[in-house]
Amino acid sequence: MDFKPQINLLKGFSDFNFGQTIAEAESIFGKPEESQVLDDDILETSCTVLHYWDLGFSLFFDNKNFKKFSSVEVDCEDTVLYGEKVFSLKEQQVIELMKVNGYTLTDTEQQEWGEKRLGFDEAGLDCYFENGKLSSINFGVIDDINSYQFLPN
């Protein structure tokens, strides 16, 4: 497979769009090396995760939304964001790349396990740095709080 990892913020990952199914993921990327179900009783969430370890990413599917693709975690060094190999960029370069593309840094946080998180909420993007080097990226769909729908009985 000639795979080119590309972040398409608010849309998807490479040729795989948010809202697509597990079957569609497997038709594009093949069978995952591992899959698992993650449940969070406090947040009342559940997702199925397809891990493509050799390709450097994991796909998350929302079990409470018909198992639709909702987010991805990437650590592949060849990943491209806005034409740049994002894993070769330093923190300030990532912030600048996002800024010139219309997204501002929302928050930063030092994680318990040692990584520093840069959050770009409007883009649905979190970048994790360890010792000044980008180590992983999480991005996904954004829940629109204004899209609440009331369905009468």
Locations of regions flagged by a protein language model:
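Short helix/turn-capping signatures at newly exposed starts of structured segments
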Residues: M1-N153
